[in-house]
Amino acid sequence: LILGFKYAEQRHYPCVQGRTFFYPKIGRLAVKVLTREEQTKLEQILYQELSPINIGVLIALYGGLRIGELCALRWADFDGQNGTLKIDKTLLRIQNTVREIPEKTKILIGEPKTESSNRLIPLSSFLTELLREYQKEDGDYILTGTPDYLEPRICLEKYKKILHRAGLSSFTFHSLRHTFATRCVESGFDIKSLSEILGHANVNTTLQRYVHPTMERKKQQMDRLEKISIWGQNKGRRHS
């Protein structure tokens, strides 16, 4: 409902003009991030058969896309020469307000939710090479390999089946985006670049919502303190 009102405001629908809406604050649930071992299990299943949906999951895992952005991707958005993905659309199912049409909901393909979400994502070399190998016609959707789209609900169902085959617990599709951000930080990404790749308006969003240090990462950071401790300094002398 909140998304519906916000969409109507952005599109300047007459029914909401001049009205003030107070949205309830909703506590954010922590998003689970795949460990490196879990990510390996998932990728092993994906590489067994590089179907369109499996390729899509890899794009989300190594590009940080939202599910609506992924569903809206066509092969025309992939630049194989420069190794980039253009994100300028999102696909979602919304409430149908036309009374003459019996369906309660309809599919909308439109602009991403914010201006910063319109972006050009540089892909890693391995993903660029993989996409080149499986590239279809420009008008085809990446998730289907045909001119027909795959809506988020069906995409999610297929994703859950992949997780089941990998023997993993229930991770949301958004977990892939958070896992991407976490791996980037672990690999030494600068936050500004990561923020722009994720389509965030500022780095604070990236830091507050998408950086999930693993216990291994925390341990590595804590071990740095040994260098400044008397024990650590004496340890260095003992081994010299």
Task: Label each PLM-derived region with a short phrase.
Residues 77-84, 170, 189-209, 234:
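Short, polar N-cap/turn motifs at the start of nucleic acid-interacting alpha helices
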Residues 90, 100, 122-169:
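Active-site/catalytic core of tyrosine-dependent DNA strand-transfer enzymes
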Residues 8-17, 80, 91-98, 131-139, ...:
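Proline-centered turn/helix-capping motifs that create local helix->coil transitions or kinks
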Residues 1-20, 66-68:
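N-terminal DNA-binding recognition helix of tyrosine site-specific recombinases/integrases
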Residues 33, 91, 128, 198-224:
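Catalytic-site neighborhood detector that most strongly recognizes the C-terminal catalytic loop/helix
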Residues 10, 58, 62, 68-69, ...:
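C-terminal catalytic core of tyrosine-transesterase DNA break-rejoin enzymes
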